[in-house]
Amino acid sequence: MAQGMEAGTRIVTFEINDEQEDFTRPWLENSPFPPQIDMVIGDIFQLLPPMNLSIDLAFIDANKRNYVEYYELIMRYLRVGGYILADNTLWDGHVVDEAYNNDPQTKGIKAFNDLVAADERVEKFIFPL
């Protein structure tokens, strides 16, 4: 991602699991782009608002139960014309498999998909990989 960015732009990544820091930070620091990437350890719901960022692109790959909350938070800071990418929106087919209707993560993804589908502020599509 950083390779395709314009000079002066940056990536801010939020990681709630501090155990991931020891694994991830050396990769970031040894990449060709360390000044462009900020890794913030902690809860995005507490840390993002005081940062007052304008977001061009957000990538959601977090607790599936909270995708709706991540979306609503990010929308407050997303610039006009910005993008939100969300991982696992098909959740390995679980979102259409009735056997997973009571699974909390599947419910979270379904709620997210329904919210985005109904949100007239955004253009949307699912790109299955």
Which residue stretches match the model-derived regions?
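S-adenosylmethionine/decaboxylated-SAM
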Residues: 1-129
